[in-house]
Amino acid sequence: RMSGFQIRGVVEGFYGAPWSMEERARILREMARLKMNLYVYAPKNDLLHRHQWETPYPLEFIRDFEKLVEEGKRYGVSVAMALSPGLTLTYGDSGQIDALVRKYLSFSAIGVKDFCLFLDDIPLTLQKESDQAAFSDLAEAQVFFTNQVYERLKNLSDVTAFLFCPTQYCGDSLTAYLEKIGTGMHPDIDALWTGPQVCSQTIPFEDAEAVSRALRRKVVYWDNYPVNDGSMAAELHIGPYTGRDPRLPLASRGFLINPMNQAM
């Protein structure tokens, strides 16, 4: 039951053409009807979200996003801004930490209180020589960077929630990477997880128990259904929503659905 989760919502996290602001507004209204409370802006093909994350969003976009935030307030749905800097990130670069915080703050100024840092779909090892010299592995670097960003942002703005997507976001929870993330990450940061697979046919209760134990916090699920990007682009996923254990709210904090490009 979705109502059992503290965080209930939608992550616009697919590859392909992003929704328009009008489509997002319709999504917010539908989310309110379904008693959802969080929408996350994270379209992979928005260059300023991912590949050009250091570039500020133009004023016109921020003004349109402010209208979306206000629309969300009317319907009881928080609108979160996610950034995905991992493809070009130097984890130990204080200038890049500052750049990311500044970009978040540009949305804090228009009323955003929920923020996300996504480090998914990037290499599993450190790519920059300076990071290889400064950190023992990817997990240590990500813990350092994420904690720095969160603590600076928290000191400068009103943060209700901060969600982190790890580079290993599905499968085996008994890994050294997740162990380091769990022990080192600030306890107030939420961690995202897609389940046994990237697109999980089923999400059993045991999965939630295991990954929440590994990460030392109740996980927030990023459920890649009914998303139909990539090799699934020719498909429409309109079948019944099944295979999710009804006990999941007992071992996880939230559930975000990654929808189809054609969702509305």
Model-derived segments and spans:
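Feature activates predominantly on carbohydrate-active enzymes
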Residues: 1-105, 109-113, 154
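Short, conserved phosphate-binding/catalytic loop or strand-edge motifs used
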Residues: 47, 119-125
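Short, histidine-centered active-site or binding-site loop motifs used for metal coordination
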Residues: 83-85, 121, 225
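Hydrophobic "anchor" residues on beta-strands that sit immediately upstream
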Residues: 116
